[in-house]
């Protein structure tokens, strides 16, 4: 089971030389996608316990469009191991607003983390095995139509 959120990276999110966005930007998107996954799997937002690994593989810049994927790796009684991947799918070409859809996504960040649901909230999966991709700035987009 997985969920995917897509988001435009505003130029105002970049505050390092080279129009770079900090790594915490991607981790916040992982939190949103992970919460969505937990709601899909358990009907509860869950509590995030922490990351066991995080790899920053490529820079994210203002003007990019990224997608954050949260994929259920394993499910215990109350714990959920989640694999995350942040991919750049569009890239700003210059400072005039021109941009391009990338032929192949660039993997920017990978992580693995653990979420925990309260004992009274742990339930069997309630949704189909593959959730529809979601879009929206807040990560709370609507199902694709």
Please identify what each model-predicted range represents.
Residues 61-62, 71-145:
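HotDog/MaoC-like acyl-thioester-processing domains
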């Amino acid at each position: 089971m997985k969920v995917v959120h897509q988001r435009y990276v505003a130029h105002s999110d970049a505050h390092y030389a080279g129009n770079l966005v900090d790594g915490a930007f991607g981790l916040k998107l992982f939190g949103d996608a992970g919460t969505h996954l937990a709601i899909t799997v358990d009907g509860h937002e869950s509590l995030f316990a922490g990351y066991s690994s995080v790899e920053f593989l490529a820079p994210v810049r203002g003007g990019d469009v990224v997608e954050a994927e949260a994929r259920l790796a394993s499910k215990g009684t109350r714990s959920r191991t989640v694999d995350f991947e942040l991919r750049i799918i569009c890239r700003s070409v210059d400072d005039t607003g021109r941009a391009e859809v990338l032929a192949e996504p660039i993997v920017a960040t990978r992580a693995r983390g653990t979420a925990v649901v309260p004992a009274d909230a742990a339930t069997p999966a309630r949704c189909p095995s593959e959730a529809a991709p979601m879009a929206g700035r807040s990560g709370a987009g609507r199902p694709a139509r």
